[in-house]
Amino acid sequence: MGLPWYRVHTVVLNDPGRLLSVHIMHTALVAGWAGSMALYELAVFDPSDPVLDPMWRQGMFVIPFMTRLGITNSWGGWSITGGTITNPGIWSYEGVAGAHIVFSGLCFLAAIWHWVYWDLEIFCDERTGKPSLDLPKIFGIHLFLSGVACFGFGAFHVTGLYGPGIWVSDPYGLTGKVQPVNPAWGVEGFDPFVPGGIASHHIAAGTLGILAGLFHLSVRPPQRLYKGLRMGNIETVLSSSIAAVFFAAFVVAGTMWYGSATTPIELFGPTRYQWDQGYFQQEIYRRVSAGLAENQSLSEAWSKIPEKLAFYDYIGNNPAKGGLFRAGSMDNGDGIAVGWLGHPIFRDKDGRELFVRRMPTFFETFPVVLVDGDGIVRADVPFRRAESKYSVEQVGVTVEFYGGELNGVSYSDPATVKKYARRAQLGEIFELDRATLKSDGVFRSSPRGWFTFGHASFALLFFFGHIWHGARTLFRDVFAGIDPDLDAQVEFGAFQKLGDPTTRRQVV
């Protein structure tokens, strides 16, 4: 037929059997990729340290999605929350991966069957004997079935009525686990960080989908609407389907980047806004202040800060610090976190406590500035030593660590103080192993960043696809060259351009 590459899909335009076949094959490819990717990730994933080397630091992409739906155990004998297990059951990570691969194989065979046996009676219009699809009826069937699936997920899987529940955690990502969730029917259900909204919205949307599906199955569209929206044209289906997909992609790009109950930080890593707003830093200081109010020493109060909470308060876990073209996991960037060194508290020679100004997200380098409790600059690491007034040496800055591995250790040597001041710009200070993975020291993004970039990019492309195919189906007659005001009988093949008498073909 000699079709150019960008028009090859026209071969299934008027062939319902093979149109179905290629869609089944597409499902086979997607399910096959998901299962294979899961097995690959499980092969390289190290579950030994869920606190300092969680899945998102290791660049896992499909494991977090399985985990948020209730999968936590592996046939390898480990659990995502740490520790060992003896009976993971069939629905382990490997079980889900295997199910996708088996499903992919079945879809592959079904696609071949439908390609070979394309001329089925079900696709034939009994009035004309030609292949035809009742698209409004098919729309009703799909709407009804997707409504049933949506309702079932919300009413059974999420609530734990028949299923494990979903991943639920506290606002600081410390106590996450899989548990049943009750639907939130009040106004709180509209809070994107309330897990109950996931159950209630799926139940509500599923109910609406079931009712809408039944409506479209029992009520035919008016003729004027049918013709106006080109409901008999398969390209209308393509256009509206692309619209649904790009809209969903934009929504999930937002819920991933800004955070929500569907994207827990324990599975996907913190958001950039938690660094920008000092979210974890405030909670750490609140806990320390509460400890001091209970007559604990500084050392005791800081020692009670969970290492997991301190690790979130480190700029290397900010997904906006990775460049778009820096491949690899976060561990390939700044290294594998080994331990928290503790919280450094800086003081000048007058005993004033100094705070290192933290690096904003979009800076690669930032001046080291130490301010007092009133925000007045008291010390810095100068660019030009000759003009310095506030250098660490001149001000006599010392540093002492509280909590962590260096608890109780203090330094007054200016070179060492400056080293830790530079590191304090980046949040809490951790010992990082850069040798194991040959990490290059350049920050990487987390799966949260990759997911957002991918879905936002494809949503934009699909938006243009929706406009393109929508215009093609709505203005098909215009693009074909038919004058809408043409009253004369048009004979196909009489003219080179349809309906244009100036291009009459010569009879040979």
Curated annotation (Swiss-Prot):
One of its GO terms (biological process) is photosynthetic electron transport in photosystem II. It comes from the Eukaryota. One of its GO terms (cellular component) is chloroplast thylakoid membrane. It is found in: Plastid, Chloroplast thylakoid membrane. It holds the Pfam family PSII. GO terms for molecular function: chlorophyll binding; electron transporter, transferring electrons within the cyclic electron transport pathway of photosynthesis activity. It is a multi-pass membrane protein. Binds multiple chlorophylls. PSII binds additional chlorophylls, carotenoids and specific lipids. The chain crosses the membrane at residues 21-36, 101-115, 140-156, 203-218, 237-252, 457-472. Keywords: Chlorophyll, Chloroplast, Chromophore, Membrane, Photosynthesis, Photosystem II, Plastid, Thylakoid, Transmembrane, Transmembrane helix. Belongs to the PsbB/PsbC family. PsbB subfamily. PSII is composed of 1 copy each of membrane proteins PsbA, PsbB, PsbC, PsbD, PsbE, PsbF, PsbH, PsbI, PsbJ, PsbK, PsbL, PsbM, PsbT, PsbX, PsbY, PsbZ, Psb30/Ycf12, at least 3 peripheral proteins of the oxygen-evolving complex and a large number of cofactors. It forms dimeric complexes. One of the components of the core complex of photosystem II (PSII). It binds chlorophyll and helps catalyze the primary light-induced photochemical processes of PSII. PSII is a light-driven water:plastoquinone oxidoreductase, using light energy to abstract electrons from H(2)O, generating O(2) and a proton gradient subsequently used for ATP formation. This is Photosystem II CP47 reaction center protein. It comes from Gossypium hirsutum. The lineage of its organism: Eukaryota, Viridiplantae, Streptophyta, Embryophyta, Tracheophyta.
